Amino acid sequence: MWLKHELVLKNTVRLPLLATLTTALMLSSMLVGCLGGNLENDIVYPDDVMYESTNATIVEVWEDGAVVETTYPVLSFDFNESSAPSAFLSYTVRGTYVDETVDASQTTVVDVEFKHHGFHTLELIANYEDTPDERGDDSRHLNEIVVRIEKRIEWRESSTNEPIPMTLDSRHEVGDHPPSVLVLASTVHNPALIANVGGGQEVEVLWELIDDTQEACQFQPGTVKDGESASWNTVHFNTDEVHDLRVTYEEGQDAIDVSHTVDIEYEALETVPTA
């Protein structure tokens, strides 16, 4: 009798345990189906969008006080490796000052032109047909990235007796971060009065970087001999305001050529390229 009772007790314990294990296996199978299959089919991974560069520079050229040329950089974003449950309809790159969309049946590359310096926060979006996501939107938000756009200003004046002040508005045009530094390179050339002979005089000049209080933040005097050049190279870190770069010299001296190059640079906080 004792042996029989023991056998019944063991069977009683095994049956609930078997039921528990069976339930666990069923739940596990359901979770595998939900987490495995759907994720593979439905999610478009951010790294599937390829971009070789996330920083570029606007170049603005001035001659005798007027803008003559501006070159805006173009960055490309390739959605070729992206995947979704159904066919893509379009690809979009969108930000504060940019909004470019292409037909997915024609190309996978979105080219974006940047006309404002600073940090652009961009959304990379793909639209695919008849498969609303959990938000009830046919658009699948792929990723959000940051692009750094800097600016270079090239300034030239020829044969001038009254150099024009170069106004530098270095305040950031997009994003929350001001430029990290202004890099200035200025050259004054004193052309020979008679080519290959000379006969002119040396020129005394003064470079000044003037802030919005009309005070000189920095200055540099220089002497430019006949037929030669002199330069002033400096950096300035108070960037989120307007300055004037001035070259002055005494009246009655020989006409001079003036050239400035100013780079408005930002800290490298952009997203790392994927290609």
What spans do the regions from the language model cover?
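C-terminal edge strands of extracellular/lumenal beta-sandwich accessory domains
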Residues: 130, 199-213, 236-275
